């Protein structure tokens, strides 16, 4: 990852785009498919890089920034449930200094001189849920979903042992929130049953719990050993108690399971002592935990602290360090991605780390192999922090056998056998054979039909692979003629292995439904390198319609200077991305394919649907000491109203709020003729907005 301190604005824009796309994909895999693609530590590293970039370049914050979201958009198979109070995730602390910073932020934000009591509890590695009771009767159970809208799992939640269906002496409306999990031994027993029945084993207890809870058939859920803890009261918690410790006492009296392992800390030392106790004893607990949650105990203080886009200010999760294991590197295989990138993968002697059997690990790129001096038959150290695909940290050179084998970077593509062109300095190695490469063609089709692109449900990885292998599709266009081909064929798809009449009918219905698509989705679906959802939206906004888009892209092929300059001037489209766009449309087959798709699809013109307010997208700078509110509280209010708060004044600044002893920033704002107001005017402004 690049050094944030040295990065240019153009590089930052590109990196923010890439991070938004990556994190969105990882969120979808984790929250919706229950199938994590990267380790917790890798995810946290990406997310923190995104935050640091946004802090340095606040004017570059994207509409689809990961810092504004939690979870992922829910799937379509369950009814939707809107949370009255968003179910947000927690910010992370990775060491004692991060925790001290969290405590200091509370003191500064609330202008406290003394330590405010912090409630500490284990962070259960399970699936978050909400349960709503009306007149004491359980009426709705829901998953977190994207934090704002979850999935209705009422029937499934009722099958969990000891989960109250009816409670007495509670308000007319009650919400509880908590975590559903599977204990370690139950997980091992469940996987043994899966294996005996010839079914796939679950990767870890969290996946097993999530998969069990998200069953359409609640009788399957009833057979799974699910357990739960409640830890908050959602929209109604402050009607029940005035603090977190009082709330849990009340919920326990109502018959809910609460985690008895907790601590009300009155100092930082007590916080760290509880953390060390749990870290030391985590392996002895019957369930998996991946850290400790700290939250302000006093609800009135929580209210004053409020929230940022994806997490509360009054709480944080102190993560445990990764679990380290050692195993043997058996071989290195190579995967070819959608844009031709070759990625090495370590095939390992299976090892159990933290209750999960691991047999593969990503190596990211070929320089990583050389840098760590990895050789086949080496004994390697693995890091796992909630991982499914963990990270190789290094080699145990003391145990290196005499017969190890070095890995040679391939000279030819492992999929199409075309020659690879690269230099020893290249970090990324790509196959340039495009759609003539079977692996790239397969991945491009997978991307085209994916949720955030054409959204063709029923065309998952296995189905696409099957249709290609059988010769039923070979490119994007073939998808829309699949029904016609099936109708005229003697070998019907519904009679083939893995298919049935209903699944085929649904597939054809979903393909037909996908023919109505927005311009941003269509552009994203094309799979142009570095054109993620945000850049696709930029292009759609610029060109407005499909006809104009394709016409302008054809002009780009003729080296038309006006269109080149127009693209270059788009915020977010730098030189490198522009080269990727040109390379894509330089391929005649790509233009022809897009034109044919344009004849089949109804590609809707771009429409700006975002609601605007007086402060939306305005860049605001606070300077000096504000008389009645803290700087942090003022910043939080501005961001809540859609403004972007910057640390310095520039020609892009829209508004400066000046307090007492405002210095150089105020002077610069006057020089640039930027609007300046005081705290009283600011409070009036936000009240009117």
Swiss-Prot record:
It catalyses: NAD(+) + (deoxyribonucleotide)n-3'-hydroxyl + 5'-phospho-(deoxyribonucleotide)m = (deoxyribonucleotide)n+m + AMP + beta-nicotinamide D-nucleotide. Transmembrane segments: none annotated. It is an enzyme of class 6 (ligase). Residues 610-689 form the BRCT domain. Its cofactor is Mg(2+); Mn(2+). Its EC number is 6.5.1.2. Gene3D superfamilies: 5' to 3' exonuclease, C-terminal subdomain (1.10.150.20), BRCT domain (3.40.50.10190), DNA ligase/mRNA capping enzyme (3.30.470.30), Helix hairpin bin (1.10.287.610), Nucleic acid-binding proteins (2.40.50.140). This is DNA ligase. The lineage of its organism: Bacteria, Pseudomonadati, Pseudomonadota, Alphaproteobacteria, Rickettsiales.
